Each structure stands twice: as C-alpha cells, then as structure tokens.
C-alpha cells in the first residue's frame, strides 16, 4: 500500500487505516466522507462531556485527498485510507501540549523576572497566541489531511480499535462542527454504518443488532436506490426530473418512473394541504435567486425579476398526473423536489431496511432524522439545533418509525445590509421567506415532516397553526428571528431540556381541532 506520510509506507503497527466512501472524483483528488467514531460519542455521553461535545463528535464531513496514479475509482466506491500514528500524535501534541507548555513556561519566566501578575499574564497570553502558529502553518500545508493517502478500492473491514483512532485523527484534522438542524445524541457504537452522498448532503445510516453480512447487503440496496434518486430527482442535472421540466416547458407530456409519479402526486397533495406554502413547482423561483447552485448567490433579485416570476404563477395544481404520464398546463412550472426529497428518501430507505429484516436503525440526513426500533433499552435521542448559538434548543426521544425534520434560514443563505436571504422561497412573493429562523416537525412520515417544516417556515404568525393542522402534523417547534420559541402541546410534551435548560421561554400554541382540509382539483 502507498505510504501516507513522509515517514515511509503505511504498513507499520502504528499506522491507522479507515475505509471511507468516495463522494466525488475531481481530477487527481478524491472527496471522501470522513466521520468521527460513534464510540467516541457514546464515551462522551457516559462521561458527561455535554451535548455540544456529543454533537460535534458524531457527524460526517468531507475531506479531499490525493488520488494515486492509476487508481480507478468512482463516486460510491470505498477506498482504504491510511494515516501514520506518528503524525496523529504530532498533531495532537501541537494542538494540546505545546500551547499549555508554552504558557506555563512563559508565566514562570515572567514571574522569575519580577514582573507583576498582570504583566506575567500579558506575556503568557502573547506566548500562548504564538504557540498556535505551528498548528496554523501545518494546516496551511493541508495538515493531517494532506498526509492521508489511499491506494485501492476495498470491501473489507478494518480493525475496530484502529478505525476509531483513525476517525478521531480525522476529526482533529478537519475541525468538525455541528451541521444540519437535528443530530442523534444517543449513539452507541454501531454494528454497521454507511455514509451516502445524496441531494447535496451526506446521509448516514446505522444499523444495530443484525449480522454484518445482512447489514452490508441492505446497505448495498440502499446505495443503489440513493444513487437512482440522486440521478432521477435532481432538477438541475441530467436525469428524469430535468427531462420532465424541459418537456413541460415545451408544453409536452412526459412518461416518468412509477416512483417519481408517486412522489409528484404526494407533493401535489401536500401543496394543496399547505395552501401552496409548500410548492415544488416553484423551481424557477429557486433558480432565479441562484439557490440551485452549489455556491450561494450574491445579489438580491430586482423587482422586475420578481414580478416576472409572480406573473408565471407556477403551482403544483397545474400538473396533471395520469398513471405515469405527467403534463403541465403552465409552462412556468419547474419542479424542484428539494423541500421534501430528503424526507421521501428516508421513507424509502426505511422500507428497504424493513424488507431486509433490520428492525433497529437510524437514518440521518443533516436536517432530518428517521428511526427504526431503538438501540437497546433506550429510544433514539435527537437534538434540535439552536439556530442562533452553538448548541441545541432541546432534545426529542424518537419512537420507532418517527421522523424529525428541521428547515430554516441558517444553512443556505446570503446576507445583504444585515438582512438574511435564505433558500426557502415564499411562493406568494417569489422572495426568500422572512421572520422565521427554523421550524422542526415530528411525525411518522419523513416526506410529510420535511414538507411541513418548509411550509411552516413560510406561513405567517397567525396562519401556521391552521396550516399545521391541515397538513396533519401535531408536533411542531417554531423559532422566529427575534429568538421567540413556539411549540404545539404535543411537541412541548416531547421536548427535553439539555445543557441546563432551554435557550428561551417556550410559548405553547394550540392547533385548531376542526379544520377543513383543502382538496386538490382532479389531475
């Protein structure tokens, strides 16, 4: 195997190896998914390290490494990556030991020179600051990540202890942080875990209590289905949905896969129930604002552009779905399934795992978590991110089959003049939604939770309880841009305080009991 560092081949007993999934191939570089060991999170929980530590430990990040000449690899493959244990120890020393040692020595020398306590503290602070310079220089030279190398695609299993140590090293190197709206808190070491790259995000699946061969077979099925979803449901990449959008813009009907037809019908029904606040037909508005691209936009759209978007008036009820044939009466309709595709993907993944005989698993897609069964004697415990601070609002223990999805303005956005413009577009104004920072929805269906979270971000203060009731969701947490927190009685009863309490008082809002469910016109 090719050496990973400056000190020779990666074959010694101190070398750490890990099997990582390739999410992209960029010339002579590979983008791989690297996560911190679940065992670390379990240890942190047991020792009371705190929720923030747990959440920063248990997540996945992307890392770029060099691709050896001649290595043939494609997204979805797995590669063996090695890191020298010596380099890991050196990085830990630079990060933790050198600053502490430099500070203590500086204080001792300053005191010996007769400086006052204030002067000694000042000298120690300056020395402490400069003691981080070697670590900064190391990172500028790509740090530990630049010392990782891979040589071959594999399908084997690495030694558990060295896998855990390697993940810890990658976490140190990559500076992992909290991402997404929800995060699994209770995380014992999984029997089998896989990370997939779907819809521009990392989707983690962990199974428990089944033989590894059975779990690996199930993961292979999931991987194939996720790749198909990513290809067929992407609005701005070659695939079935892009072809459908082109056909509708030309006034033509289009034959789609039965799975996509079912998803579009579900989206149409949810759009009607939300009174159009959730509407996948506004992909043209998303594209006009630039949120379809990988990089965030930089400019506010003019009133003329917005007026043109509104004049098109695209909506899901413009669609007619007959079996697997789809057509639109409005050429302005451009479908973007991003507001509920992750939830729908988790629903399908849950069905795949159940069909494979797997009873206990957790699926984590950044802003959404869905669970099967539990992880022993305890339910899966999930944190809801505080959109204002580094921490969480609270935690929810999920029951088997439940899904918790969060949407908000804190992930994809740009700022102009102190105003945040998010990727969630209000179909009524053709502009990014305002006034709400995040909404979390708990239900027994991933697509419903995902879509409702988007709709309730857009809904106004007076309308959101009615919209929630119409969409059939009862457990909702809503945070506005002034920091106010609102929860339905069902969500308030499930929400658990962490880290000493909630970040703000929670106002309980009752949902109306008798609401008329809007019906979609036939089509």
Curated annotation (Swiss-Prot):
Q: Name one GO molecular function term.
A: metal ion binding
Reaction catalysed by this enzyme: L-threonyl-[protein] + FAD = FMN-L-threonyl-[protein] + AMP + H(+)
Species = Rhodobacter capsulatus
Q: What is this protein called?
A: FAD:protein FMN transferase
What does UniProt give as GO cellular component? plasma membrane
Residues where FAD binds = 277-279, 336, 342, 423-425
Task: Give the residues the record marks as binding Mg(2+).
Answer: 339, 450, 454
**Lineage: superkingdom:** Bacteria
Keywords (A to Z) from UniProt: Cell membrane, FAD, Flavoprotein, Magnesium, Membrane, Metal-binding, Nitrogen fixation, Transferase, Transmembrane, Transmembrane helix
Per UniProt, the enzyme's principal EC class comes to transferase
Q: Subcellular localization, per the record? A: Cell membrane
Q: Does the keyword Transmembrane apply?
A: yes
Coiled coil located at which positions? none
The similarity annotation says: In the N-terminal section; belongs to the RseC family. In the C-terminal section; belongs to the ApbE family.
The reply to whether Iron figures as a keyword in the UniProt entry is no
Task: Please give the cofactor(s) recorded in the UniProt entry for this protein.
Answer: Mg(2+)
């Amino acid at each position: 195997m090719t050496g990973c560092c400056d000190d020779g081949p990666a074959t010694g007993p101190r070398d750490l190896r890990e099997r990582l999934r390739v999410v992209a191939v960029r010339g002579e570089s590979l983008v791989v998914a690297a996560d911190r060991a679940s065992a670390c999170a379990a240890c942190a929980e047991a020792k009371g390290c705190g929720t923030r530590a747990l959440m920063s430990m248990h997540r996945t990040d992307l890392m770029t490494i060099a691709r050896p000449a001649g290595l043939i690899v494609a997204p979805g493959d797995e590669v063996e990556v090695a890191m020298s244990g010596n380099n890991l120890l050196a990085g830990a020393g630079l990060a933790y030991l050198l600053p502490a040692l430099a500070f203590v020595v500086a204080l001792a020398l300053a005191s010996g020179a007769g400086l006052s306590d204030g002067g000694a503290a000042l000298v120690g602070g300056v020395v402490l600051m400069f003691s981080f310079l070697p670590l900064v220089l190391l990172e500028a030279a790509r740090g530990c990540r630049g010392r990782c190398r891979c040589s071959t695609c594999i399908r084997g299993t690495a030694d558990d202890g060295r896998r855990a140590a390697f993940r810890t090293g990658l976490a140190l190197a990559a500076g992992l942080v909290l991402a997404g709206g929800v995060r699994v808190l209770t995380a014992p070491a999984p029997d089998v875990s896989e990370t997939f790259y779907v819809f521009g995000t990392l989707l983690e699946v962990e199974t428990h209590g089944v033989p590894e061969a059975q779990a690996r077979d199930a993961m292979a099925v999931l991987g194939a289905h996720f790749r198909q979803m990513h290809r067929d449901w992407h609005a701005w990449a070659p695939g079935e949905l892009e072809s459908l959008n082109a056909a509708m813009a030309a006034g033509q009907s289009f034959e789609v896969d039965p799975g996509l037809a079912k998803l579009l019908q579900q989206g149409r029904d949810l759009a009607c129930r939300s009174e159009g606040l959730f509407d996948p037909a506004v992909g043209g508005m998303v594209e006009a604002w630039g949120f379809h691209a990988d990089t965030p936009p930089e400019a506010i759209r003019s009133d003329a552009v917005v007026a043109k978007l509104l004049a098109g008036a695209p909506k899901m009820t413009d669609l007619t779905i007959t079996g697997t044939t789809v057509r639109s009466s409005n050429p302005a309709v451009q479908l973007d399934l991003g507001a509920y595709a992750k939830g729908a993907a988790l629903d399908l993944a849950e069905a795949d795992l159940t069909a494979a005989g797997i009873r206990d698993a957790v699926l984590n897609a950044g802003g959404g978590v869905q669970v099967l069964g539990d992880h022993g004697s305890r339910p899966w415990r999930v944190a809801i991110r505080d959109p204002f601070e580094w921490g969480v609002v609270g935690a929810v223990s999920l029951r088997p089959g439940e899904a918790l999805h969060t949407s908000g303005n804190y992930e994809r956005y740009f700022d102009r003049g102190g105003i945040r413009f998010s990727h969630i577009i209000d179909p009524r104004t053709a502009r990014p939604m305002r006034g709400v920072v995040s909404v979390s929805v708990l239900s027994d269906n991933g697509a419903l939770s995902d879509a409702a979270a988007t709709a309730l971000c857009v809904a106004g203060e007076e309308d959101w309880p009615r919209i929630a009731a119409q969409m059939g969701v009862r457990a909702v947490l809503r945070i506005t841009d002034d920091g106010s927190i609102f929860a339905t009685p069902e969500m308030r009863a499930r929400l658990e305080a962490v880290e000493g309490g909630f970040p703000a008082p929670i106002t309980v809002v009752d949902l109306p009991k008798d609401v008329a469910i809007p019906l979609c016109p036939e089509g």
